[in-house]
């Protein structure tokens, strides 16, 4: 769980980012804070630095990762402010988590390559191919606003969680990635970076969160959550009142 909002000053639950981290066990950091995006508050370097300082100290005091999830827009300044902070201060790069780095054009994707090489972490939007703004491979679940030619918002929807699996299928079946490498993008990488306890690996005494895929086309066969079977090829477990909602 993250506290915060697109704009700075961010919205918090207790009135303070540090207090949210210390007092609320589920809060791991802040975000998404929008940068270089038409929905952001166009924060200054000092405002971003103050937020990073707060999340670092709050993370240290609470024993949490303390990360800020930055929603990246398509402005020509890209991630220049974050590079400046990284080069001019002692804030570690691990506290800056960049998202949408794959769907804002090839220049931002090149920045992602440099950021990862410097030891940073990015994530990529597993969009449908027609929604990508770059020629790179289909790049996880996100909101999908639609605008007209004048920039007016005409629709706001959400992409399906299954797009994460589709991205993995494409990497393996279309681009010949080894399966054990492709699945890391959605499983072990985020679990390790965000320090999710007992998650991300098939290890004794870890939560038994498992999906079973068809060996040929990687289609979903079984879903197991914390050791409980949730889906088989012929059956899906429903919530106790879910059948009631179908009639509303």
Map each language-model feature to its residues:
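Active-site core of metal-dependent hydrolases
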Residues: 39-40, 47, 52-147, 154
